[in-house]
Amino acid sequence: MKPISIIGVPMDLGQTRRGVDMGPSAMRYAGVIERLERLHYDIEDLGDIPIGKAERLHEQGDSRLRNLKAVAEANEKLAAAVDQVVQRGRFPLVLGGDHSIAIGTLAGVAKHYERLGVIWYDAHGDVNTAETSPSGNIHGMPLAASLGFGHPALTQIGGYSPKIKPEHVVLIGVRSLDEGEKKFIREKGIKIYTMHEVDRLGMTRVMEETIAYLKERTDGVHLSLDLDGLDPSDAPGVGTPVIGGLTYRESHLAMEMLAEAQIITSAEFVEVNPILDERNKTASVAVALMGSLFGEKLM
């Protein structure tokens, strides 16, 4: 059992809705530390990465990317913190914050692996670039940036690019893609299980295939779990909810199967927004899923 280091990233600059910066606090309040300590893990909480201020329009220069400078700076700090955690032989567990923070997490983790795999558990593909993004929100770009596509301020975080390869990525739970993203996923040959596949195959088979696929090709796997991957009835407190999502039960099963397979080497849970939530339900769901990921069982 690897010791776990928790890093909070109160980032809300990768999108426009207020409140997601309170996600790390909400998950701590929902008892993440106590839950993992009950499973006999050695836990340290490294506190939060400092986040700069939102940029005014005139400060953005010619960039279509909202808050590019502040997002890049925070991700550089996060990459350095995660790098340190991995160097110390600990498991980095990152609490978001919007999904733009995955750029920093992956930058810190990937340098320690030859072939890092990624499970992207999300309603969205997050493979936009400045050219394809309808919004200019960086939380829709972290996977593209980590694959080496997009603005150099994002792709070069941690001082190297790319962090990961398309054939080492599996997308699960996707049900909302922009046109440019569909083209990107097809062209790069990224393995994807949309909700259509999840419904047809069932979650057990999706996870069995995902685990077998990554075990064969990678030497470590990062889990990037966006709470909007779940259906809004189970996880209402997210900034970009999409109906028809993964259930709590399916997600719980997915985490249990990952725990049994023992392939996950780092993880982040993102997009918990307490302002949009109902009585901290979404943060509690996130913490319950972390419990399952780290081996919590009913019996």
Curated annotation (Swiss-Prot):
Lineage, uppermost ranks: Bacteria, Bacillati, Bacillota, Bacilli, Bacillales
What is the annotated quaternary arrangement, including any partners?
Homohexamer.
Query: What broad class of enzyme is this?
Result: hydrolase
The protein's name in its UniProt record: Arginase
Q: Which domain of life is it from?
A: Bacteria
Q: Which residues bind substrate?
A: H124, G125, D126, V127, N128, S135, G136, N137, D178, T240, E271
InterPro entries, alphabetized: Arginase, Ureohydrolase, Ureohydrolase_dom_sf, Ureohydrolase_Mn_BS
Species name = Bacillus caldovelox
Q: Which GO terms describe its biological process?
A: arginine catabolic process to ornithine; urea cycle
Q: Where is the signal peptide?
A: none
> Mind listing the GO molecular function terms for this protein?
arginase activity; manganese ion binding
Task of the protein: Controls arginine catabolism.
